[in-house]
């Protein structure tokens, strides 16, 4: 078959192929079982294969690259406008193929297996942190029903209250409640141990990667943030500028301009929420500690704080840090504070 471009609709078991030649004539439209996919593409001459950036897309992108094909991943929201008629696999594959023909189409970079492994650690850690927060809130709520209130916020205060209640003699709570609190305490300690173990694994990965080590010199960037940014961004040279990288993270203002009048709103919040959250949390810590410092960055932050709310300043610093991280990753240079 004389194929120049293929749209491949991914699934668990049945894949849909839509292929066109260099004249945009349809020359292939068929279904493939999962076991047939590699053999089908192995028999084809090298061509452009486009897929939606969905579950297992990076795996199949790596597999098809090994077979000599050029692979492009497209975000689903950019494919949807090209779907004709009702949604089914054949229309989806055709839409993917059509979207890949657009000269201005934006593509998702293919991640390596190592990048996905690091991201998996971050995803699991994030889920465990959410579970720990929910459990702490549950413990505080249950104890509050018996008039036992923590005087401070945070995990340490919750655990201290829990241990105080369990150690008090005579027991201030009914016997069934005491047994329940022991189970909740064990569950909370298990979550703490699992989170700590994952953080040690992430830190070990950071220590073994000189590229990530360079990111730690930026104020507001710790091992968790540096590891997550490096794993998600991959080759930062895919972004032409630092502003494009910040926009990819959703840290630039949303724009609604017309007739030459520029109107900027809140940040767009596009892209990876987890990465954006880490950068803003790190920036917030820097903003909180800048009051008594005299370096250029602290003076800049102090000036902003006189005009804008602290959270706005934190987002501005997160934007600046994102641009710095892009420069360090794309140019493979060390951070030199201004």
UniProtKB/Swiss-Prot annotation:
Keywords: DNA recombination, DNA-binding, Transposable element, Transposition. GO terms for biological process: DNA transposition. Transmembrane segments: none annotated. The keyword DNA-binding applies. InterPro entries: Transp_IS110-like_N, Transpos_IS110, Transposase_20. One of its GO terms (molecular function) is transposase activity. Pfam families: DEDD_Tnp_IS110, Transposase_20. Required for the transposition of an insertion element. Belongs to the transposase 20 family. This is Probable family 20 transposase. It comes from Pseudomonas aeruginosa (strain ATCC 15692 / DSM 22644 / CIP 104116 / JCM 14847 / LMG 12228 / 1C / PRS 101 / PAO1).
């Amino acid at each position: 078959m004389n194929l120049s471009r293929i749209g491949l609709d991914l699934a668990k078991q049945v894949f849909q192929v839509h292929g066109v030649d260099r004249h945009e004539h349809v020359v292939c439209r068929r279904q493939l079982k999962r076991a047939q996919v590699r053999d089908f593409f192995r028999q084809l001459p090298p061509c452009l294969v486009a897929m939606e950036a969905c579950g297992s897309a990076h795996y199949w992108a790596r597999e098809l690259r090994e077979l000599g094909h050029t692979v492009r991943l497209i975000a689903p929201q950019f494919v949807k406008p090209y779907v004709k008629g009702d949604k089914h696999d054949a229309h989806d594959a055709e839409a993917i193929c059509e979207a890949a023909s657009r000269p201005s189409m934006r593509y998702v970079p293919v991640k390596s297996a190592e990048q996905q492994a690091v991201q998996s650690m971050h995803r699991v850690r994030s889920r465990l942190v959410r579970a720990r927060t929910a459990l702490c809130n549950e413990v505080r709520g249950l104890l509050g029903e018996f008039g036992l209130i923590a005087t401070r916020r945070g995990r340490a205060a919750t655990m201290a209250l829990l241990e105080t209640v369990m150690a008090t003699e005579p027991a201030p709570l009914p016997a069934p409640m005491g047994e329940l609190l022991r189970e909740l305490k064990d569950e909370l300690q298990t979550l703490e141990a699992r989170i700590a173990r994952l953080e040690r694994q992430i830190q070990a990965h950071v220590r073994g990667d000189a590229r990530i080590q360079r990111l730690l010199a930026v104020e507001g960037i710790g091992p968790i943030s540096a590891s997550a940014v490096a794993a998600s961004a991959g080759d930062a040279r895919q972004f032409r500028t630092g502003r494009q990288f910040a926009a990819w993270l959703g840290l630039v203002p949303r724009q609604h301009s017309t007739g030459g009048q520029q109107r900027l709103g809140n940040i767009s919040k596009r892209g990876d929420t987890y990465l954006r959250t880490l950068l803003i949390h790190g920036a917030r810590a820097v903003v909180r500690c800048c009051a008594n410092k005299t370096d250029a960055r602290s003076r800049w932050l102090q000036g902003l704080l006189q005009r804008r709310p602290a959270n706005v300043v934190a987002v501005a610093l997160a934007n600046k840090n994102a641009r710095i991280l892009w420069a360090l990753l794309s140019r493979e240079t060390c951070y030199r504070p201004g």
